[in-house]
């Protein structure tokens, strides 16, 4: 018995040292193939943060290792990937996802497996409200918050004929629900004269824009983004949709969606987004400079 105790005592420092050398693995899953314009800059920011954490000593004296997987923008694939990260890679927790429906699927997985999930991008409020669970947390303002940011300005303009256009999936449906509800509370006199819900990533921009033109709105609420937004803006400019209608668009101020518009960028829109060149706090200046130095590019 005594030799065994002595051996354990002798080996203890080496066991502790070996444990300290083992990195803490965390799992990240996202729709890199589906939305590279948004998620490649995101990935660069994630890698920069990981490098900074490890350079400063890691977490609890251990390096941080991020195991990255692509979820193909599909709820079923995302759950399969999440299971692989937890069961095979033995990560401490998982984070990421882009689409709201994918985020909800992974949140349900986290609940069933009782593993921490930090949703990086999904905006649907259901993620932490209606369908929330104690294992799921979010990084970004939800759809309710994003919409509420614009409602006061929308109400103050005094426009009464509103048209709606939003992608036909969880995020778009949630945005429409909250905008109509919040605006109607502040302005009971508004009417919604047209509503278009194109499939995500497959907008028939000509037909959608013409339907809105025919409805003669004096204001438009949109939650389109990415290529759907580009096509909508192009057709809207061509058909004069924005000439007599003020536009409120969630996320159109995100550089990933704003920059590709180039000379077609409309003026006077009310948007939410990330004005990376205008935020002048010490923390953001440090981040912006570090990102530029590491990647020779601006953050977005």
Short names for language-model regions:
Residues 4-16:
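Bacterial N-terminal signal peptides
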Residues 80, 125-126, 133-238, 275-286:
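Extracellular/periplasmic Venus flytrap/periplasmic-binding protein
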Residues 235-300:
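Extracellular/periplasmic periplasmic-binding protein-like sensory domains
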Residues 44-66, 184-190:
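Signal peptide-proximal N-terminal region
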Residues 85, 89-98, 118-120, 163-166, ...:
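Periplasmic-binding protein-like
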Residues 23, 38-44, 58-127, 139, ...:
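Beta-alpha junction/loop-to-helix N-cap segments that form part of ligand/metal-binding clefts
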Residues 27-47, 69-76, 98-99, 168-173, ...:
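Extracytoplasmic "Venus flytrap"
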Residues 18-22:
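Boundary at the C-terminal end of the N-terminal hydrophobic targeting segment
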């Amino acid at each position: 018995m005594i030799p065994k105790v002595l051996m354990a005592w002798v080996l203890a420092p080496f066991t502790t040292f070996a444990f300290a050398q083992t990195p803490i693995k965390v799992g990240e899953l996202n729709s890199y193939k589906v939305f590279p314009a948004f998620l490649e800059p995101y990935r660069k920011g994630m890698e920069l943060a990981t490098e900074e954490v490890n350079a400063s000593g890691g977490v609890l004296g251990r390096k941080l290792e991020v195991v990255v997987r692509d979820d193909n923008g599909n709820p079923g694939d995302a759950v399969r990937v999440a299971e692989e990260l937890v069961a095979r890679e033995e990560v401490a927790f998982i984070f990421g996802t882009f689409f709201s429906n994918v985020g909800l699927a992974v949140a349900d997985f986290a609940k069933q497996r009782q593993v921490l999930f930090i949703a990086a991008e999904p905006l649907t409020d259901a993620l932490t409200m209606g369908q929330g669970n104690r294992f799921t947390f979010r990084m970004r303002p939800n759809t309710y918050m994003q919409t509420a940011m614009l409602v006061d300005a929308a109400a103050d303009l005094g426009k009464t004929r509103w048209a709606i256009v939003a992608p036909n999936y969880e995020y778009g449906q949630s945005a429409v629900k909250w905008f109509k509800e919040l605006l109607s509370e502040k302005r009971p006199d508004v009417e919604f004269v047209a509503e278009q819900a194109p499939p995500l990533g497959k907008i028939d921009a000509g037909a959608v824009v013409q339907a809105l033109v025919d409805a003669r709105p004096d204001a438009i609420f949109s939650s389109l983004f990415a290529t759907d937004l580009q096509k909508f803006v192009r057709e809207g400019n061509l058909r004069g949709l924005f000439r007599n209608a003020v536009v409120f668009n969630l996320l159109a101020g995100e550089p990933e969606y704003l920059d590709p518009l180039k000379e077609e960028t409309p003026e006077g829109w009310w948007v939410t987004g990330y004005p990376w060149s205008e935020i002048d706090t010490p923390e953001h200046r440090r981040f912006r400079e570090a990102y530029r130095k590491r990647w020779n590019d601006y953050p977005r």
